[in-house]
Amino acid sequence: MFEYLTGLITMVSPDFIVVDVNGVGYRVAVANPYAYQEDDQQAVQVFIYQAVKEDAITLFGFATQAEKRLFTQLIGVSGIGPKSALAILATPDHQGLIDAIQNGDDKYLSKFPGIGKKTASRIIIELKDKVVAVQDEVQLDFTAPGPLGPSAALQDALAALESLGYTTKQVERVQKQLEGLQGELSTNDYLSQGLKLLSR
């Protein structure tokens, strides 16, 4: 079983990243791929959960041990699979997620894809006491995977550009220019600027 991978990010896609470890590329599913950046110089550490099925082995990656622990707690709830757990962890507000579980806020949990009221209630019942251990064991710093990645607003804008039909390479081409923009920009601001850059 893998505990973590330390290597270079050689590919970033809407659903996964590729971590090159000594010339071997590992495809790793992560909640927010665009929090990572392709970099052939600076290695990053990605914590790993390995899911083994009869027909496939899937690696799920996390920026911190705390995020990985929360993931394993979520998939331990009946009705929550790895993909649903990743979708939940895609929210940038992990503290808000934990608060919702502790406070019994099923409306907050029901907003995630594939999570109905019954499943939200199960999450609360089964994890209300367990998520405290995540806070006690590891400082909550879910959003810093090695080198600093783009903001949540920029991540959303990059994902939106791909959903509009632009290729990963096209989006990556304008990403650094968008990161250099000054001021606090919204997703729409980044999207508008990105479209202008791509139209050149």
From Swiss-Prot:
Matching entries from Pfam families are given as: HHH_5 (PF14520), RuvA_C (PF07499), RuvA_N (PF01330)
Region (Domain I) location: 1-63
Top-rank taxon of the source lineage equals Bacteria
Gene Ontology cellular-component terms for this entry are: cytoplasm; Holliday junction helicase complex; Holliday junction resolvase complex
What are the TM regions of this chain, as residue ranges?
Answer: none
Instruction: Set out the biological process GO terms recorded for this chain's protein.
Output: DNA recombination; DNA repair
Q: Where in the cell is it found?
A: Cytoplasm
Q: List the residue ranges of the region (Domain II).
A: 64-142
* Protein name (database record): Holliday junction branch migration complex subunit RuvA
**Species of the source:** Limosilactobacillus fermentum (strain NBRC 3956 / LMG 18251)
The organism that produces this protein has a lineage beginning with:
Bacteria, Bacillati, Bacillota, Bacilli, Lactobacillales
